[in-house]
Swiss-Prot record:
Residue ranges constituting the PNPLA domain according to the UniProt record: 33-234
Species of the source: Arabidopsis thaliana
Tissue: Highly expressed in roots and at lower levels in flowers and siliques.
SUPFAM superfamilies reported for this sequence: FabD/lysophospholipase-like (SSF52151)
PROSITE patterns with a match to the protein in the record: PNPLA
Residue interval(s) of motif GXGXXG: 37-42
Pfam family, one: Patatin
Keyword flag Lipid metabolism: yes
Protein's name according to its UniProt entry: Probable inactive patatin-like protein 9
One Gene Ontology molecular-function label: hydrolase activity
Coiled coil regions in record: none
This protein's UniProt keywords: Hydrolase, Lipid degradation, Lipid metabolism
Length: 384
């Protein structure tokens, strides 16, 4: 009897899986949007997602189109993680709660509360940010009108947000895939954003616990290990056959990676040194964060060297120092094989416009729900 029940269960799951796979278009590339951490304003990413959404609406003729309609997964670190979560937070009907403009407006208007400065030390010279103020703002943002506090499962598209766990001395990646597998890997969205933003020199580590209380981590800024989360997103898609069954390699991917510019400190090399010639803690963090982003960009530049149009990286080239409009007018920077960087003839704005043409041509994202949401049969746990 036990063998018959197991066989029936397997047959049910197999049929559900076949039905699910039949809806997947194997010819369409899987679209990834990745947003870097770095800084407190996210000016490069903010300018980029505003232009991205504007172009999507312009080229589709749909004034209500959202960025999440044309991407299959969104990843973000630090301030980029907050923007990513805002873009995919589900309003309860399967639609995003925030447009790109809403998300950027939220970060801009709430910036002084998200990063409320307070001074510590005997002479009040040490600058830190108030974790309580950020937590209050984030918890309000990720709460629906009916009072429901959103978790990683409450996103209209897969979401990936990294942090660094001091308890295990290893990266910890929050994902919707993990949240769908088990409540032990499901976390409240506001806590995820708080965790990935806990820069060591400015915030205290943040203790985050899963919704069932079984998994916890002592989180600091994900930028220490994954400031540019693009590689993590690519790896996640390549190994997550449940949600992305048609992806066999980078040839099946279309990636837009949004940088956040060099940190304020790193933009002026001489300011990294104290008067005695030592580096400050915040300067070391800046160096690590910028280095991580550049290293990931070089790796992906090599991986996509035969199909460069499938990987677009938007980053400030450092030749101008202006606002959002100036950043979009800057000539783009591309990483060639072996770490060589070259200035392109296209501006960052033009590169986004060209990328949107490919997005629109491929149509709206139509990833079906995970099989585990259609069946009481739990798939084998294969990690996050």
């Amino acid at each position: 009897m036990e063998m018959d029940l197991s066989k029936v269960t397997l047959d049910i799951f197999t049929k559900l899986e076949q039905k699910w796979l039949s809806h997947c278009d194997s010819s369409r590339k899987t679209r990834i949007l990745s947003i870097d951490g770095g800084g407190t304003t996210g000016i490069v990413a903010a300018a980029s997602i505003l232009h991205l959404e504007h172009q999507i609406r312009l080229q589709t003729g749909d004034p209500h189109a959202h960025i999440s309609d044309f991407f299959d997964i969104v990843a973000g670190t630090g301030i980029g993680g907050i923007l990513a979560a805002l873009l995919v937070a589900d309003d309860g009907s399967g639609r995003p709660m925030f447009t790109a403009r809403d998300a950027v407006k939220f970060v801009a208007e709430k910036n002084s509360e998200l990063f409320e400065i307070r001074y510590t030390g005997v002479f009040r010279r040490n600058k830190r940010y108030s974790g309580k103020s950020m937590e209050r703002v984030l918890e309000t943002a990720f709460r629906r009108e009916d009072g429901k506090v959103l978790t990683m499962k409450d996103t209209c598209k897969p979401l990936l947000v990294p942090c660094y766990d001091l308890k295990t001395s290893a990266p910890f990646v929050f994902s919707r895939a993990g949240a769908s597998e088990s409540p032990s890997f499901d976390f409240e969205l506001w806590k995820v954003c708080r965790a990935t933003s806990a820069t060591p020199s400015l915030f205290k580590p943040f203790s985050v616990v899963s919704v069932d209380g079984k998994t916890s981590c002592s989180a600091v800024d994900g930028g220490l290990v994954m400031n540019n989360p693009t590689a993590a997103a690519v790896t996640h898609v390549l190994h997550n056959k449940r949600d992305f069954p048609s992806v066999n390699g980078v040839d099946d991917l279309l990636v837009l990676s949004l940088g956040n510019g060099p940190s304020t400190m790193s933009s002026s090399p001489g300011r990294k040194l104290r008067r005695n010639g030592d580096y400050s803690t915040s300067s070391v963090v800046d160096i690590v964060v910028d280095g991580v982003s550049d290293t990931v960009d070089q790796m992906l530049g090599n991986a996509f060297c035969w199909n460069r149009t499938d990987y677009v990286r938007i980053q400030a080239n450092g030749l101008t120092s202006g606002g959002a409009e100036e950043l979009l007018k800057e000539r783009g920077v591309e990483t060639a094989p072996f770490g060589v960087k070259r200035i392109l003839t296209e501006s960052n704005g033009e590169r986004i416009e060209g990328f949107v043409q490919r997005l629109v041509a491929s149509g709206k994202s139509s990833l079906p729900p995970s099989p585990c949401k259609e069946s009481a049969v739990n798939p084998l746990a294969d990690g996050r």
